Amino acid sequence: MENAVEITNLTKSYGKNRGVIDVSLKVQTGDIFGFIGPNGAGKSTTIRSMLGFLKYDTGSIKILGMDSVKDHEKILKEVGYMPSEAWFYDSMKVSEVIKYAADVRGLDCNAEAEKLCKKLKLDTSKKIKQLSLGNRKKVSIVCAMQHKPKLFIFDEPTSGLDPLIQKNFFELINEYVSEGATCILSTHVLSEVNRYCKNAAIMREGRLTMLESADIDEDKFLKFYEDEEE
């Protein structure tokens, strides 16, 4: 099976501070891949390097067969990315933000956006400044999904979402994956990975410590947090 993502010996540092160190992993096309670890483990740095938002020190990254540096703009057209923090102009309406995200890609996503907003119970008539954290997350999810990309990358997508919306969110992921998409889910919530992901990678202190199927032993995983705090 083809790989949607191939990372080889990725290293990224921030001066004297740790980023990621010699990370290598592959994500198969059609996978729901869990990227899990404590906060500060290097998950977001890896994702931003994948998308070309960070210039990494050494290594190579291929996304959908394209080079993450040379083909940066092409990759962004094929990827739906949701960052861990959703920032929008407070004065804009939800509907305006969603339409703007589609217009940037030169696409008409009205029908898909409407379906997503209904599934996520998102009121598009409100202004961003009126929204709770959870509803801002919903806007970010719609912006990442509405163009039906080949690869979804979600960074801590469910924080602030109530249980019903979390369930609906994962139903949407399963729907798109059944149509041929691939999903990377970066999270620190082990239960999400065990319930929804097919495969997973665990990061700690900038290093990939484990690659395994997504049935991860809870005691083993909690030890990473305990060791991190010592």
Where are these regions (language model features)?
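Helix N-cap at the start of a conserved alpha-helix in ABC-type nucleotide-binding domains
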Residues: 163-165
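Conserved ABC nucleotide-binding domain
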Residues: 113-130
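Catalytic Walker B motif of ABC-type/P-loop ATPase nucleotide-binding domains
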Residues: 152-156
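H-loop (His-switch) and adjacent beta-strand-loop-beta switch element
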Residues: 200-213
